[in-house]
Amino acid sequence: GGGVGDATVRFHRKTARGKVLKVLRETYRRDDVPCGVVAWETGADADADDRAPVLDASGIVNSTASAHYIVIDTNVVLHQMDVLESPVFTNVIVPQTVANEVRNRSMPLYNRLRTLLGDTDRRFWLFYNEFCASTAITHDADESINDRNDRAIRATATWYQAQLRARAPTQHVRTIVLVSDDVACVHRARTDGLHACSMREYIRGFANATQLEELLSARTLEERPSGDAHGFDEYWETEQLEAGVRAGTVHRG
């Protein structure tokens, strides 16, 4: 296994009666969290996880960008699942942050996401970004949980992009596309140098774009007030911690 670091996670949690409690948890961050890329998952990387890597060398065929993988955000799962379930979507990276948020918002959608993640032919990969030393971020005091989560998703996309550029062999995928229906998130990602677009923009790159557009939700590329990325309740941390306990990357104390 790889090295382990620790960090203290601070957050506030509401009780059933509405009382706000300050909670501190120590998390353990690892440098061997598998990224799911078939070409790289050997030796030490593979030892950290019992899942077989699924992200292949050819990536997705879509004219939006050269061969690529996509990273999706929470809005895409919540509002565009019908599109996401289309067979043209393969080689999709799902940050742990996204899975946690979806689980807290909609168990039916979370179960549909888990089905995609469990279908190796679809090549969806759950990446534990909250426990990877290279992608885990702290929660800034002046940002909302939702803004923090958006930043975590962008950090995941940025890390994958850097890894592909540095490590990908010839004729291998070298590009990441962040697909988000949040205007602010797309803008910030582009400012950071990432290729980012809305789901509507993205599906125009498929040969069957017309059919996919029929599945598209009207809730695409939404504007939002600053500090309120999704209007989600701020309960995601508990799920994050429980997921970490199950994964063995967070230890109860």
Predicted regions and their residues:
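Noncatalytic, typically N-terminal accessory segments of nucleic acid-processing enzymes
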Residues: 1-253
